[in-house]
């Protein structure tokens, strides 16, 4: 049995290996956005529980009733049961601060010409992209990044740019 984090690390390891990057490091700075009180619930469920049309980008998890925090066992459609923990979560600015730290960690490699592959969930990668571009992290909501797709961030004439997106 593996914990959620161990399973994610195995998935990331396999993804990195398939992309030709066998040597990897875990960057906690690009861990999945902590949805807190919304974790394990659909947007519809959260909206019903909160009494308003909740949106993670606009409202964040801390806008939700603290009564939504706690621990429970969720049963997946496959029948598998997984533990869910809900704390207060983090707002988009806190997630953005983490991604700025990740960028700072990989910049020395980029500055000497190395390629860097970051494997993570779409929301945190969208937020990271906003920080790469130097724009407000809420801009990330406008960047569609589908499951199992990639993007390439690079520099062009001294500016951080998006070279390819949602490929």
PLM feature spans:
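Generic beta-sheet signal
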Residues: 112-122
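Short beta-strand scaffold positions
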Residues: 3, 97, 119-120
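Short glycine/proline- and acidic residue-enriched helix-loop micro-motifs
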Residues: 51-94
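Alpha-helical elements of the RecA-like P-loop NTPase motor core of helicases
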Residues: 10-14, 104, 126-127
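Generic structural signal for well-ordered alpha-helical scaffold segments
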Residues: 96, 100-108, 129
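Phosphate-coordination/substrate-recognition cap region in phosphate-metabolizing enzymes
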Residues: 1-67, 159
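GST superfamily/GST-like fold recognition
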Residues: 122-126, 156
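Acidic, low-complexity terminal tails and accessory targeting/binding regions
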Residues: 33-45, 108, 112-114, 130-167
């Amino acid at each position: 049995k593996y914990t959620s984090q161990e399973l994610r690390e195995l998935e990331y390891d396999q993804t990195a290996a398939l992309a030709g990057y066998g040597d990897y490091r875990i960057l906690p700075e690009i861990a999945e956005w902590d949805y807190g009180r919304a974790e394990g619930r659909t947007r519809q469920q959260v909206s019903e529980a909160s009494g308003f049309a909740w949106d993670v980008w606009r409202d964040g998890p801390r806008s939700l009733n603290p009564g939504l925090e706690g621990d429970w066992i969720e049963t997946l459609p496959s029948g598998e049961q997984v533990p869910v923990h809900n704390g207060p979560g983090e707002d988009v600015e806190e997630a953005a601060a983490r991604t700025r730290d990740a960028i700072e960690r990989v910049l020395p490699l980029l500055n000497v010409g190395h390629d860097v592959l970051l494997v993570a969930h779409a929301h945190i990668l969208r937020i990271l992209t906003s920080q790469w571009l130097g724009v407000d992290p809420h801009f990330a909501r406008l960047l569609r990044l589908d499951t199992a797709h990639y993007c390439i961030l690079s520099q062009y004439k001294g500016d951080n740019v998006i070279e390819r997106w949602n490929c």
